[in-house]
């Protein structure tokens, strides 16, 4: 086996997860809602968990948030802006520089469970399109991790068999599904550890 491609998750890997008070905690306090009441309202936005597979457009989930929380037009704009600030977190500059340095020796990719609007927001902030050759957003392809079909799509777009791909994700179930598909899965715990593991795999 010779590794030809390395793929990364975004949230929790290339982006550090932001604290909840950047978005939901802030708005629960602002609207004066109890935690249970606030969570019950939010559950009505995406009860079938379909945002990540493209079942709700950005316009649709904006409307739903406005309806369940009773937001005015100006409030929903601010709410969504806060959502994207939270969603995009903080860039892990070290890991992102490392990922970019792998090209052109290796094909590089992103596979992210996402919501409509994510490509725009993350490109604006971090310019991923200039750093990675292949970018797969779940809401755009109708498939989400840990569904193994998204890994099949990754390999197809890369033109590389599974056993020649390394994939880094912070969720065990996503890593396990990738491994079961035949990909070399790496559970992200820290930047240093992930870089060391990738280096060991691409050196073999």
Residue spans of the language-model regions?
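Asp-based, Mg2+/Mn2+-dependent phosphohydrolase catalytic module
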Residues: 1-8, 115-204
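Alpha-helical elements of Rossmann-like donor-binding domains used by nucleotide-donor carbohydrate transfer enzymes
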Residues: 22-26, 60, 64, 82, ...
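Generic structural signal for small/hydrophobic residues in well-ordered secondary structure
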Residues: 9-12, 54, 102, 110, ...
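Active-site neighborhood of HAD-like aspartate-dependent phosphohydrolases
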Residues: 1-43, 180-181
